């Protein structure tokens, strides 16, 4: 029983109180302790690492009463005094107890159950088990008390004896005074301890509103204690203890070891268990009410982080050692505390946390263990169970005195873990070896009072932690600071203090990179340039000489270009913007010029003036948009060239040089003859119906045209439109089908149509010489340009090359690429060829041979329709191949006729006839639509006549006579032009609007008769033109001959083909030469069809008929013939051995008058006679007739295929009988020798030999891939090839 007494006296250590863990049997989770500091948590981990301590955990056998009222506490103090007094009377047991006390014990305060409320924790005590000798009766009474102290539990207590009551009353006055003092001090210290410990809740979190939990539990506990009448319970307990006081002390150890064997105690334990369950139920109900109540709990609000916090590196500890040592180290914890301060500040803002201060939650890690203990609990709180016996007063006094001494010695003898911090459950190893000295009760009380006063006077150490320097932190982390870094090599290595060798390639790469990235245009400073010039000097003799001279020129400083392009491609974009702006300016200027010309053209009054003006504006807008698309790519090409140059000015100088090197050529160009589809939009479209007459003066150009051309040249130089792309897009004609040949004047005597003014152009400027339709002139309708964009394959017309002001069109349309530079004979079109046809030599006034070759290279490619990429618009683009070709080849290509120079004059008439015949079938509108020329008045032609001869001219020969002849011809043309001018102007004005509308029409308009002229047209002098138009419509005799020959040949070929097929059908079997379709066409016959059904014969060659495209009459005749043939074959089957005379009569019906047929009949008759005689001589067994077999008299021996559908029924029945399965036979009979045969089938076997059966099987089942022919054909073959052998 002594062990029980020792456990009942519990020494309350202040740190144990602050961190007591209550074990709860319920699932509420209450009792989990919250640490105010993370150091305490880590300390718990480190406690387990120490080897000096052995954690002994004993489940307490006692349940302590809640100290709620004053009466309870008075009763406890009285029992305490009785124990002290009784202890002093029993001094004979000192030796036994001192021996028991001298055993060293390591005690950890027992972890109590959570049956009691939180207030029970405040009075919980951990004790050092040091007890004096106690009589056996006292131990028995204490043992019984341990199990009966619980409120609501002990219902089976014995009645109290009268002696016990008297003793209690007698000792009341003695105990009262000292115990009241102890009670007050205990209350004060328990309050201080309660403030220092962390509050517990049922979820393991810090319950800051402690009143909510404590008050609820305490109120329920108070009410329960009032109901159960605590005073009555205490009286029962005391009576029970007194009844057992007389038992012997000798049985102390036995009772201590076997205290669970007594039946009385078992009954009391049953009652205690019931009380414990009732406390559990009450506690769980309390926890349920608390859980269901609405509490505003402050949740953890993390500090909002900025984006910079996420990119910061985590601070890594710069120390040695593994990670666990860093985590356990004391110096590593302040950084974690600093992180938690903001969160605690947030929690402090909530008003429910006001009474929980930060100092209460934190304990300074540097505060010594003794001071912390003294500051929190100054006195030893000795709490015993409520029921005490009177006889224990003396022994209890000795116990208290021994405990005080042992407690004072404990701080000197115990091993304290983590001296600089207080963490977790602090386990103190106490060795009680001091001798037991009994002291009177007054001494004990005085010592307790003095200890309380001293501990209250001791000042609390400040909680602020002094800042440590980096060196101290490193020392605390275990870094050896005595080692200093040095520049020394390790073992086996060396330190190279020399500078590394420079990497030349890397440096060059950096320089190159910097050169490209940091390139700056250097401003050109003032400098001197030597300019080579040529001066004329007159000598003393009066002769002029050319002398070369050098003139120094001082170039001024150039300002650097301010626009420094930083981005790639920026310069190109800027150039594009500049180009577009220049194009807008140029289009606006040209629009103004066209408007002025239009007004001048329509001054003499046109009926539909306003309407025509609107249409013109629309067409101009569309034409401009299309011209922009045509010009723009050329600009891009030049911009790429400009990127390679330093400045844009250099581009202009290069173009100036190119243009300066090439002399200017004046080529008189053919002009188009106006049809209904030609364009009469503007004044300069001066294609006239009277141009067929050689009357107009050649080689004239107006001042207005010169002005336009001169104003256009610098812009074109600036924008550099000399690209092949623009040449193709602007000069390739759009296909405008308008097959109309109305009122076209063609004079057969004149092969070429003369023009009043030849086009003046430069060859290097050739590609940019057309804006929308060969722009030296104004653009025409939008159809010309817009169709270039979406026409998939436009026909390349070389006539666009020369589209100029007053151009001439050659009607030799035999070749699509007919050149307008050349006439029908293939020579350059310069004037008329009547007198100079014998002299065909090219002469240029001041052009050397190289320049001529360069120009002819372009002309050769353009006229022949070969638009290659080498055509870049400059004269140097294509020089390699064409220089080697002779001029004759050029002329032949351009004219489209490969003739020699000697035959040129003799072929004029045939060429004109060809021209007339092909002009009917060809389309003229393409060439006419793209050639726009300016209409010149008579005065303007006369004014500019003199200026035109100042330019270079293409002359037919070098002789002066040819020049004189050409001048005479031009004068004649002038006179003729004056006569016809008035008439042509009237015709032109009246046809303008109609021609413009026709351009927008398509080919379908011809079907509706829209090509017929309206009745209100001008009909004056139309008879002459209509007659000539009628003549033009007629083809030539040669063409008529060709057409008739073609038709005749087609008819005769069809007839021959039909006749040939007829003979093939008659005399050849299907396998012979004329198998038009696939040679192995299988024709299947169905089972139950008639044997005479030959439906497939009638349409066997239908595919061939469709391919050949024969007419219906031929099909009808062939169908009739096939019917006759079928009937004939059917009759032959009925009479297989009929006379040959019948067949001969049938053959005579067809082609009796043919000698070939007569000969064939004789030969076949002889051959058949021989074969019949041989067949009759050979004895033959007539086999079973195949009902499916068709006897064809004209077929080869029958081809047997592997199809079972073509077999007769008898063969199929035999095959079915042979293929019957034997059920008794083994399944894998491939390599099986013996086979069971049913006897019934042996009897049914016929007398036919087996060889015949095998033969039939072999015949019936041939290889499906090959044909097997019978050795003896059953059908008479009448193939003609057998007879001809």
UniProtKB/Swiss-Prot annotation:
It is found in: Nucleus. Phosphorylated. Phosphorylation at Ser-864, Ser-895 and Thr-906 occurs during checkpoint activation and requires the ATR kinase. Phosphorylation at Ser-864 within CKB motif 1 and Ser-895 within CKB motif 2 promotes interaction with the catalytic domain of chek1 and subsequent activation of the kinase. Phosphorylation at Thr-906 creates a binding site for the Polo-box domain of the plk1/plx1 kinase, which subsequently phosphorylates Ser-934. The lineage of its organism: Eukaryota, Metazoa, Chordata, Craniata, Vertebrata. One of its GO terms (biological process) is mitotic G2 DNA damage checkpoint signaling. Residues 847-903 are annotated as: CKBD. The CHEK1-binding domain (CKBD) contains 2 potential CHEK1-binding motifs (CKB motifs). Phosphorylation sites within CKB motif 1 and CKB motif 2 are required for interaction with CHEK1. This is Claspin. Interacts with both chek1 and plk1/plx1 when phosphorylated. One of its GO terms (cellular component) is nucleus. Residues 248-258, 603-625, 634-653, 940-949, 958-985, 1014-1038, 1143-1152 have a biased composition (Acidic residues). Residues 149-158, 171-190 have a biased composition (Basic residues). Keywords: Cell cycle, Coiled coil, DNA damage, DNA repair, DNA-binding, Nucleus, Phosphoprotein, Repeat.
């Amino acid at each position: 029983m002594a062990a029980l007494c020792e456990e009942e006296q519990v020494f309350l250590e202040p740190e144990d109180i602050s961190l007591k863990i209550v074990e709860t049997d319920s699932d509420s989770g209450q009792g989990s302790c919250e640490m105010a500091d993370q150091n305490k948590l880590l300390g718990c981990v480190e406690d387990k690492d120490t080897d000096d301590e052995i954690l002994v955990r004993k489940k307490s056998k006692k349940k302590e009463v809640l100290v709620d009222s004053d009466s309870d506490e008075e009763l406890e103090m009285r029992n305490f005094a009785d124990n002290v007094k009784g202890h002093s009377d029993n001094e004979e047991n000192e030796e036994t107890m001192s021996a028991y006390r001298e055993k060293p014990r390591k005690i950890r305060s027992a972890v109590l159950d959570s049956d009691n409320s939180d207030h029970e924790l405040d009075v919980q005590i951990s004790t050092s088990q040091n007890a004096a000798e106690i009589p056996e009766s006292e131990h028995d009474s204490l043992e019984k008390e341990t199990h009966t102290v619980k409120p609501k539990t002990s219902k089976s207590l014995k009645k109290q004896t009268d002696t016990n009551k008297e003793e209690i009353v007698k000792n009341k006055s003695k105990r009262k005074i000292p115990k009241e003092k102890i009670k007050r001090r205990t209350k004060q210290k328990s309050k201080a301890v309660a403030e220092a410990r962390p509050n517990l809740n049922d979820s393991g979190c810090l319950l800051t509103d402690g009143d909510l939990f404590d008050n609820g539990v305490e109120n329920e506990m108070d009410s329960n204690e009032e109901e159960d009448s605590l005073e009555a319970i205490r009286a029962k307990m005391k009576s029970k203890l007194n009844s057992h006081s007389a038992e012997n002390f000798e049985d102390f150890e036995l009772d201590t070891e076997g205290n669970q064997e007594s039946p009385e105690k078992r009954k009391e334990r049953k009652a205690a268990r019931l009380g414990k369950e009732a406390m559990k139920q009450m506690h769980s109900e309390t926890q349920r009410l608390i859980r269901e109540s609405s509490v505003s709990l402050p949740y953890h609000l993390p500090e909002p982080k900025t984006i910079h916090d996420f990119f910061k590196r985590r601070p890594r500890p710069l120390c040695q050692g593994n990670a666990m040592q860093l985590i356990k180290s004391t110096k590593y914890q302040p950084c974690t505390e600093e992180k938690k301060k903001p969160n605690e500040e947030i929690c402090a803002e909530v008003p429910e946390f006001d009474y929980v201060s930060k100092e209460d939650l934190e304990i300074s890690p540097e505060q010594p263990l003794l001071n912390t203990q003294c500051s929190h609990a100054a006195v030893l709180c000795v709490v015993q169970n409520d029921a005490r016996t009177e006889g224990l007063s003396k022994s209890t006094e000795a116990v208290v005195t021994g405990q005080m001494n042992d407690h004072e010695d404990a701080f000197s003898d115990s091993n304290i873990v983590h001296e600089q911090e207080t963490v977790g459950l602090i386990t103190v190893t106490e060795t009680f070896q001091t001798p037991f000295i009994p002291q009177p009760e007054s001494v004990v009380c005085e010592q307790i009072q003095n200890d309380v006063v001293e501990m209250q006077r001791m000042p609390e150490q400040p909680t602020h932690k002094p800042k440590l320097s980096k060196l101290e932190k490193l020392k605390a982390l275990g870094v050896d600071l005595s080692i200093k870094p040095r520049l020394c090599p390790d073992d086996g290595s060396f330190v190279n203090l020399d500078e590394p060798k420079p990497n030349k390639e890397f440096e060059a790469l950096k320089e190159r990179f910097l050169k490209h990235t940091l390139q700056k245009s250097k401003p050109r400073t003032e400098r001197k340039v030597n300019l080579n010039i040529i001066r004329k000097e007159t000598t003393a003799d009066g002769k002029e000489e050319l002398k070369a001279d050098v003139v120094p020129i001082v170039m001024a400083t150039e300002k650097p270009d301010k626009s420094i392009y930083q981005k790639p491609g920026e310069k190109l974009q800027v150039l594009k913007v500049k180009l577009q702006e220049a194009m807008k300016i140029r289009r606006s200027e040209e629009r103004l010029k066209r408007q002025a010309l239009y007004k001048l053209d329509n001054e003499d009054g046109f009926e539909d003036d306003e309407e025509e003006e609107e249409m013109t504006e629309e067409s101009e807008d569309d034409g401009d948009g299309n011209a922009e698309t045509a010009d723009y790519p050329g600009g891009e090409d030049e911009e790429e060239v400009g990127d390679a140059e330093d400045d844009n000015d250099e581009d202009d100088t290069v173009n100036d040089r190119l243009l300066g090197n090439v002399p200017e050529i004046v080529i008189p160009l053919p002009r188009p003859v106006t049809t209904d589809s030609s364009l009469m939009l503007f004044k300069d479209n001066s294609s006239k119906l009277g141009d067929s007459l050689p009357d107009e003066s050649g080689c004239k150009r107006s001042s207005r045209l010169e002005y336009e051309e001169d104003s256009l040249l610098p812009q074109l130089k600036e924008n550099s439109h000399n690209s092949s792309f623009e040449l193709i897009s602007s000069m390739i004609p759009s296909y405008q089908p308008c097959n109309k040949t109305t009122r076209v004047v063609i004079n057969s005597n004149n092969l070429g149509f003369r023009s009043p003014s030849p086009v003046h152009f430069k060859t290097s400027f050739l590609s940019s010489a057309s804006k929308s339709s060969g722009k030296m002139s104004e653009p025409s309708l939008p159809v010309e340009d817009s169709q270039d964009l979406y026409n998939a394959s436009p026909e390349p017309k070389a006539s666009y090359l020369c589209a100029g002001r007053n151009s001439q069109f050659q009607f030799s349309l035999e070749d699509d690429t007919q050149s307008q530079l050349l006439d029908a004979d293939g020579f350059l079109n310069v004037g008329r060829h009547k007198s100079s046809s014998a002299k065909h030599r090219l002469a240029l006034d001041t052009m050397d041979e190289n320049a001529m070759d360069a120009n002819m290279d372009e002309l050769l490619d353009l006229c022949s329709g070969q638009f290659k990429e080498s055509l870049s618009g400059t004269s140097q683009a294509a020089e390699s191949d064409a220089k080697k070709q002779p001029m004759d080849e050029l002329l032949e290509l351009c004219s489209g006729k490969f003739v020699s120079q000697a035959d040129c004059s003799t072929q004029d008439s045939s060429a004109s006839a060809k021209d007339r015949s092909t002009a009917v079938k060809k389309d003229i509108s393409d060439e006419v639509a793209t050639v726009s020329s300016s209409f010149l008045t008579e005065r303007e032609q006369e004014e500019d006549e003199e200026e035109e001869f100042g330019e270079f001219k293409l002359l037919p020969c070098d002789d002066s006579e040819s020049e004189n002849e050409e001048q005479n011809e031009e004068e004649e043309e002038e006179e003729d032009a004056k006569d016809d001018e008035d008439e042509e102007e009237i015709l032109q004005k009246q046809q303008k609007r109609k021609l413009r509308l026709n351009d927008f029409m398509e080919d379908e308009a011809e079907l509706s008769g829209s090509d017929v002229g309206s009745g209100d047209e001008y009909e004056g002098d139309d008879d002459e033109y209509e007659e000539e138009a009628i003549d033009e419509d007629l083809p030539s005799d040669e063409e008529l001959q060709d057409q008739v020959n073609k038709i005749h040949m087609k008819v005769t070929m069809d007839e021959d083909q039909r006749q040939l097929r007829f003979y093939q059908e008659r005399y050849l079997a299907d396998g012979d030469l004329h198998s038009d379709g696939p040679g192995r066409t299988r024709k299947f016959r169905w089972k139950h069809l008639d044997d005479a059904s030959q439906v497939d014969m009638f349409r066997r060659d239908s595919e061939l008929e469709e391919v050949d495209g024969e007419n219906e009459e031929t099909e009808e005749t062939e169908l009739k013939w096939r019917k006759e043939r079928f009937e004939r074959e059917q009759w032959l089957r009925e009479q297989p051995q009929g006379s040959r005379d019948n067949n001969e009569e049938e053959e005579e019906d067809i082609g009796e008058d043919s000698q070939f047929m007569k000969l064939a009949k004789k030969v076949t008759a002889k051959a058949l006679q021989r074969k019949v005689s041989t067949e009759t001589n050979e004895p033959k067994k007539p086999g079973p007739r195949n009902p499916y077999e068709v006897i064809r008299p004209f077929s080869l021996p029958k081809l047997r295929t592997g199809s079972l559908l073509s077999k007769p029924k008898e063969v199929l029945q035999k095959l079915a009988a042979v293929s019957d399965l034997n059920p008794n036979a083994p399944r894998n009979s491939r390599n099986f020798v013996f086979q069971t045969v049913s006897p019934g089938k042996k009897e049914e076997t016929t007398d036919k030999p087996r060889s015949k059966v095998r033969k039939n099987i072999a015949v019936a089942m041939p290889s499906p891939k090959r044909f097997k022919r019978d050795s003896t054909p059953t059908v008479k073959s009448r193939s003609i090839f057998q007879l001809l052998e």
